[in-house]
Amino acid sequence: MNRKGFTLIELLIVVVIIGILAAIAIPKFANTKEKAYIASMKSDLRNLVTAEEAYFADSIKYTTAISCVNPAPAGSVSFCTTQGNTLGAVTTGVGTQAGWTTNVTNTNTSKSCGIYIGAVTPTAPASAASPEGAPVCQ
């Protein structure tokens, strides 16, 4: 008698091994979406820094007017956030040449990211202890 195939024990061992591998792998990928939301918020803040600095180079001042149309109306910066991200109010320091600060939130996470440039009181979660121009998330 020459039977071909796997025994029930062999199949059961394979299922157990797959279960063990899944138990190890799933926690490593559990917060992947959270990391992606944070990365999109940081990216938006870095892109806003670029837009504000370009505006500053032309106007010798920062602006608090952000517009999601291109070309931007006079006195504003053309900038659109990633889908799901919401930009907080952009505030400048004493005088529009001093600097600016803002934060961004995402509808899918409770975390937020903030940034500041220049001599301005940073918007949370950024703080005076955080590096200038670097997005800070918490």
Question: Which residue stretches match the model-derived regions?
Answer:
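Conserved catalytic core of two-component sensor histidine kinases
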Residues: 15, 42, 49
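Periplasmic/extracellular, small/polar-rich flexible segments of pilin-like filament-forming proteins
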Residues: 50-138
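N-terminal single-pass transmembrane signal-anchor helix
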Residues: 1-29, 33
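Compositionally biased non-globular segments, especially hydrophobic aliphatic-rich helices
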Residues: 10, 39-42, 129-131
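Aliphatic-rich helix starts adjacent to a transmembrane/signal segment
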Residues: 28-45
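Intrinsic-disorder/low-complexity peptide segments enriched for small residues
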Residues: 6-10, 43, 85
